[in-house]
Amino acid sequence: MTKKEIIILCGPTASGKSYLGHEFAKAYNGEIVNIDSMQVYKEISIITASPPKSYTAEVTYHLYNFLSITEDFSVVKYLKLATEKIKEITARGKLPILIGGTGLYINSLVFGYNNIPDISEDLREQVRNLHTEIGNIGLWNKLEELDTLAASKINQNDTQRLIRAYEVFLQTGKSIFSFQTLPKEQILSDFNFKIIFLNPERKFLYKTCDERLDKIFKEGAIDEIALIKKQFIPQDYSNLKAVGVKEILAYLDGNLTLDEALSAAQIRTRHYAKRQVTWFKKQIEDKTTLEYSNQEEFAQILNVIPAWH
């Protein structure tokens, strides 16, 4: 039986994924599925550059801005939802097009994942409260007492991985890294993945990063984060790690001017984009890479869309 096709359009932030994916979906009767870990949250749709209404009016989009930032989400939960959407799309005779830059989600969909048991909500809250009380160093010390392997591999400043490792050990009695030795579960083995990697020339990428942040700041991101601040959500909350959030919070707290906040967010975005490019180059081997160094070359990519499908 011929395998059904899935298009994955990936690459660094501000590389043009959303635009190209939207045009591809219009041309080939596609529906778009989010594969970005931050664009699932409805309260931060502006700062994460989620698809505008002009896009969603033309093409069906899935798994964007449907969760509250106060809700826990994981790669396993994402995979379950994404798999359901992909199968629904193909059942309608349409083409699933996945757009995003979260490497863990992409890697798990394509190559399988290590099935770590779900963490109970009570335990999550317990660990979160403990972290608020003792901070990263205190939690890392507790992790080291229980799981020296995880402690040796996780930086004390990596809040999300630190909390995750501690939760997993308390829930299972095993190191989170012990699950990585188990065979990976394949969830979409009856599909054929076509991976398109957008790789802009670095100077051009940094320019688009800066321009997008400037646009986002001017088009409502300040008010968006101010509203979250009023909800008294902890500023180190893992679901608020989208680039620009902490810089705007610093501005709202009076610790940075608006120009300083924008500049800091732009610098962090460029660093993030660089890490994404490195990851995709190293981790995804079977892919089509599209390179461009200016807006004119980017526009020409539309001419090669027929070769994708």
Curated annotation (Swiss-Prot):
Substrate binds at T13, A14, S15, G16, K17, S18. SUPFAM superfamilies: P-loop containing nucleoside triphosphate hydrolases (SSF52540). Residues 36-39, 160-164 are annotated as: Interaction with substrate tRNA. The lineage of its organism: Bacteria, Pseudomonadati, Pseudomonadota, Alphaproteobacteria, Rickettsiales. HAMAP family: IPP_trans (MF_00185). Keywords: ATP-binding, Magnesium, Nucleotide-binding, Transferase, tRNA processing. Belongs to the IPP transferase family. Its cofactor is Mg(2+). Its EC number is 2.5.1.75. Monomer. The record marks T102, R124 as: Interaction with substrate tRNA. It is an enzyme of class 2 (transferase). Coiled coil: none annotated. It comes from Rickettsia felis (strain ATCC VR-1525 / URRWXCal2) (Rickettsia azadi). Catalyzes the transfer of a dimethylallyl group onto the adenine at position 37 in tRNAs that read codons beginning with uridine, leading to the formation of N6-(dimethylallyl)adenosine (i(6)A). It catalyses: adenosine(37) in tRNA + dimethylallyl diphosphate = N(6)-dimethylallyladenosine(37) in tRNA + diphosphate. GO terms for molecular function: ATP binding; tRNA dimethylallyltransferase activity. Gene3D superfamilies: 1.10.20.140, P-loop containing nucleotide triphosphate hydrolases. InterPro entries: Dimethylallyltransferase, IPT, P-loop_NTPase. GO terms for biological process: tRNA modification. This is tRNA dimethylallyltransferase. ATP binds at G11, P12, T13, A14, S15, G16, K17, S18.
